[in-house]
Amino acid sequence: MAILDELVTQIENPDLRARIATEVEKLAKQKKFGLVFEEHLPECTPLWDIPVKAGRKAALKTGHVNDFYTVLKIEDGVATCLNKDKSATAEFPVEELVCVAEFGEPIYPYLKPIDTVCNAPDSDLWHTLIEADNYHALQLLEYLYAGKVDCIYIDPPYNKEDSKDWKYNCNYVDKNDTFRHSKWLSMMQKRLRLAKGLLNPNDSVLIVTIDDTEYLHLGCLLEEVFPEAKITMVSSVINPAGKAKKGGVDFSRTDEYIYFLQFGNSVVLPEVRDVSKTPIAWETFRRHSLANGRGKHGVGACGPNQFYAIYVDNKTKKIVEFGEPLPEDMSRFSVKQIEGCTAVFPVRDNGVEMNWAAPPWTAKKLYEGGYLRVGNATMDKPQQYTIKYLTKGVIKDVEQGKVTIEGIDDEGYIIGYYEAGRAKVPTTAWSKIAHNATSYGTDILNKIFTDERFNYPKSLYAVRDCLTLFLANKPNSLIVDFFAGSGTTLHAANLLNAEDGGQRRCIMVTNNEVSESEAKSLTKRGYQAGDKEWEQLGIAQYVTWPRTVCSVLGCDVKGKPLAGDYGVEAEDYVIDEESAIVSKTTGKPLKTTVYKKTVKQLYPSLAQMKKADGFKANAAFFKLGFLDKNAVALGRQFKELLPVLWLKAGAHGPCPSLEEAAEVPAMLVLPENHFAVLTDESQYEAFAAQVNGEDSITTVYIVTDSEPGYREMISGLHAEDTYQLYRDYLDNFRINHGGR
């Protein structure tokens, strides 16, 4: 409705304007079916790099960007301006104004380098953070990476009424909307349409997180924008304690929702194997069957050498000696005694003498190998200690490496287990300790910043797990997050790369808004948007980039090494073989399984990574700016657009740059960056020879206004990707020109 309202205000005839406004209001109140909402034009774009001049549109830096004026004249630093509806003029100091462009007016973006962090100088992988309104950043990215993105992960603002003080102003509601979700849906729709052009239609995934405020409307919107996608919604517990709603008379919310949209051949990969450590089975060394009893003969009988004493030290519970086999007519009570030891024989509880599973010389070898041990003490029974051993099959598995050996017990026997598990398919209901947003989101940020700079960051492991489901088998994938927030997605990508040696690249986009309370404080102190004091407290410069730098280098914002590792421990319960529950009635052990509490490592490989070691990664920070096409010489145009060419070529190596006063070179061949640019067609022969001699050059840009000439030149090049650039460089990257 905002579009209609805007058009209605432009009707000069007051009677006609009033009648049409009345009819529009009636239409707005009619019942709607399906996802029908009022469209909103994107907000005007502030052009901070363009000077305020007569004839241009401008808005107050402290006002709303859509409340713009037309500058009529400037005298002595004061601009005389005509308001938007042309009803009145006003005067403002020029320094209080910023040029703006309306939706549909072409603008010319460039990437201004702000900072870099390099912790892997030998790697040509560079992540990217772009400070920008994500709508315009997406327009630029659509040109750079159309159909090339493997995964988009976004955590958009949740449109909550009480969230104005966040770094993101999450409350997207227009007072004139009859449907309170319209402005938010309009904002999301325009960005999702652009995002659609980025995704690889043959195999990619879009991941969107949301809470109960907008999840129903978002689901409908996703179905509308992406009818070809397979859509799955997952419920994920992020706050086990629950968050009560206003008044405390409603359900306490513990979870949020994650939409997974799969395109083409995209498949959900099994989660890392749900490994259960199955302990190796220790069998009783005493034979079981009566046919195995002492003195028995015939089928199933044991040999004459399997009835003997095993001497157990009563203090250490270790075996000190294996006695000689006893003849059938010799009593077990007649054997020698060793001080401090018990002579243990294979005897049933009812006194029936049995046999051991092997003769003493074999038993000795088993004991020395760690394959035979003393079990529980049963001093009130004929056999005072249980003796246990590993069967031939288990021993064979140990020797063949099928059993994982954790170590040797103090008594000398091996501690081992089978890694029994299966590929686990993810479910649609997640309740994972590591996804707790407080413990593994807020706490991680607080250790980096040592103060609270961002509310409600995502759990690092929640994002890591989402990415893993689709990118574990794509080590060179491209990830985009255009609601970057605190920068969790890039942090998670680095974590995933560190696990498997991958080269996944992440591009993050975020604005540089300050919170509402910070804006009020800064305004009171005389600062306004665009001032250094204002900008340095914005989310991109104050949260996203510092978090990226610190996580890569392994330190907090004060340079102190981060403590701990990236593992996550959780309580677990395992079978306790050494304990038993005794019946109060009979005094005998109950045949029940006893469990003991222990600590389980949820991410064993991550537990080996010290946070202080950082990541072998690099990242570049840019600010999206806009140039005045009519006021920028070709030389500066080329210089300012070089980072865009670098990004389009894959962001290999450090972003190249040219000196401020440097002329446009006839050619640029940059093996470290994997791309080359020809600006002077007369130098083609030398250029082609140099490019074809560099195997690392995979992208070539040819500057020419001639389509036939371009085709002829690229026919002699070996590069994988070639692009034509117009001589008026800014025209190659013009965005915002209507229709979106």
Q: Where are the model-predicted features located?
A:
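Short, glycine/acidic-enriched loop or turn micro-motifs at the edges of active sites
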Residues: H136, Y158, E214, A484, ...
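Conserved SAM-binding loop and adjacent beta-strand
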Residues: I448-Y461
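Accessory, often C-terminal, charged low-complexity segments
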Residues: M1-P121, L125-H127, E142-A146, D150, ...
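Conserved proline-anchored active-site loop of SAM-dependent methyltransferases
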Residues: G147-K164, I479-A493, L641
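Conserved Rossmann-fold cofactor-binding substructure of NAD(P)-dependent oxidoreductases
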Residues: Q139
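Short glycine/proline-rich turn/loop motifs
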Residues: I114-D124, Y168-N176, A437-D451
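Aromatic- and acidic-residue-enriched carbohydrate-binding clefts of CAZyme catalytic domains
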Residues: D162-F179, S517
